C-alpha cells in the first residue's frame, strides 16, 4: 500500500479508526510480527523512489554529477527561494574560480589582471542582484568568453530570450581556443532558452550538444552535461515523447540526481493527481468538476497511452512499479473509492499487457506482486514463472506463495536468499547522501521499509520454525527492534541471549541513529536483574544504573540479614522497595509488554507473547463497507482473528517459561510493594513508620492490581488504625498520598544518591512525588506515569 494512502488513513483515523488501533489505545503497526504475523503473509510496501532507483542501475551514463557543498547539505524543508540562492551562490563561486584559472593558464591575457578580475567580480555581482529582483546593468568587462557569456545571462534574467540566444550563439562562433570555459555553459543555456520559447525540438538538440561539447574537452565546471539529461527529458516530455523522456530521466537518476524520481512520474499516463503535490496534468480540484463525458474521454486517453507504454520495455516496467507503489492493499478499508480505484487500474493494465501479446516481459515478477496484492495467487504464480526468478523480488514472491502452500522450510530458505541479495545488491544499498533511499529501505513505524519488511518476513519464518536464535539475528540486524526485543526477552533463554550478546563484535557507536548493540546489552542486563542474576547483570546495565543496582542488591542483602536489628532490616527492605519503584523501569523493566521501556513507559505496547500463546489477535470489526461499529462508551468493537503465523509448541513452552512475574504493566511497582511489605512485617503495630510503609506500598500497587491493593489496605485496617496515616486511609477507605517519616527520609536519600551518581532529576511528570505532610485524607492522582 502506498505511503500516501497510509497518510490519508492516518489523517482519517479519528473518523474511521482504520489501521493498527489496539484496544489499549496504542497506534501501530510498530511491531512487524503483531496482528498475528499477517505482515509475513501480506504484500510488502513497494516504494516508487526505491524501484526507479533499482531500474536506474541498468543505465551507465559517462558524465559526472557536480554537487556543491551547499547542495549536499540541503534541507528539504527550506524555502524555494533559499535553494535558489544556494544555486546562484554556487554559480557565482564557480564563475570566479574559472576566470582565475583562465588568467593563470594564459587563456585570457588582460593587461591588468587584477583590474580584470575586479571587473569580472562586479559583473557577477550585477547578475546576482538582477536574479534577486534588483535589475542591475552590467559594468564594463575585459573582452573575453566570460564577458560574452555574461551578456547572455543578463538578457536571460530579464526574460529577453532573443537577446540571450543571440549573445550565446555569438559566443559559440568564436574560435574554440577562445571559449574553453563557457562553451558548455552557453550550449546548455541555449537549451533552456529554447524551452522558454517552447521550441522543444531545438531544446533537445542543444542539451545533446551540451554533452557532446563536454565530451570533446570543453570545461564543464558546473556539471551541466550531467544536468542536461533532466532538461532534455523535460523537452521530450513536452513533445509527448514519454519513450524518449524516460531513459533521459533514468540517466539523470543514475548520475545521482534524486529529482528525477519526481520527473519520472510524468511518464506514467494514469497517475492519479494528489492535492498539494506536483502533478503532471489536471489538478484534483479540476477533475472533480468534470462531466461524465470528460471522464470517459480522459479514460480513453489514458488507455491509449498505456497501450503505447506496454510496447516500450522501460515504460512498461515504470507503469508496473508505479501501480505497485500506489496500490491499496485489500485488507485496508480507508474508503471504498480508493479501494476500487486501485483494483480497476491494475485490471486495466493486465488487460493491456495481455492484449500486447509480448514475447518477453522484463520484471514479470512485479506483475506477479500486483496479482498477489489483490489476492490473485494463481495469477501471481503465473507471472513468477515468466520471470527469471533470481531477483530479490522474485524470490520474495516465491517465498510468499510457498508459505501460503504450507511449505515453511522452502519459504524460509527462499526468503533467506532474497534477504541476502538485498544486502549485497547495489539496487538495494544507498549511495552516500541518499537519505530518501535509506528511508525507503529501512523505514519503520507507520509503514515498513522494503528491507525492513524482508527482514521481518524472514525473522517471522525463523521464529515459526523454532529457529529462535536465528530469528533474533535476522530481526536484530534488520533493525526491527521491537520484534527483536520480543524474541530476546520472551523466547530465548537468558543464557542463549547472553551468549548471543557476548558474541556481538565490538564496534564504535554510530555517529547517527541508535546503537542497537548497546540497546541489546541493556535489555539483557534488565532481564538478568529480573532473573535475580545481579552479578551478571551489572556489566550490561547502562551506567550509572550499575551503581543503582549495587545499592539495590546491598539493600536486599541487608534486609535478609538476620544479624541486623529489625529496624535496620526494615530500613533496608524499604530502601530496596523505593529503588524498585522509582528506578524499576531502568533496572528491570521489559523492553516490550508489559512495561514498554521501548516507548519510555509512555504507551502500552501490544502483548505479542499473549497473542502468540492464544493463536489469535484482536482487531477492529468492519462491515462490508469498511465501517466500524462502536459500543456504548464510544470504543470500536473488536473481533478475534486467527493468527496467520502460528507459534509452535516449542515457542509456546518458552513463552510460558519466560513469563514476566507479575505480568502487569509496570510490574516492578508490584515488586516494590512486596518489598515494602517485607519492611512492614518487621515494624511494630500502630507505629507511624509501619503506616507510612504500608501506605506507600498501597499507593504503588493500587492502580496496577486492585486485589493486592485490597490486601495491603487490610493491613492498614488491622495494624495502623491508631496512626495519623492509618486514620486518613480508613476515613477515605483507600490509600492517601501522604508523607510519613520513612518516606520523607527515603525521598531525600534517593535524590541525594541520584545527584551523587550524576543522574539528572527526571522530568516533572516522572519525578519522585512530593508527598503531602498533612494528615488530611485527600486523594490525588499518582504523578508518575511509570
Could you describe each region identified by the protein language model?
Residues 9-19:
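Bacterial N-terminal signal peptides
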Residues 1-9:
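Bacterial N-terminal signal peptides that target proteins for export
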Residues 199:
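Short glycine/serine/threonine/alanine-rich loop segments
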Residues 21-170, 175, 179-189, 202-786:
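Extracytoplasmic/secretory-pathway proteins
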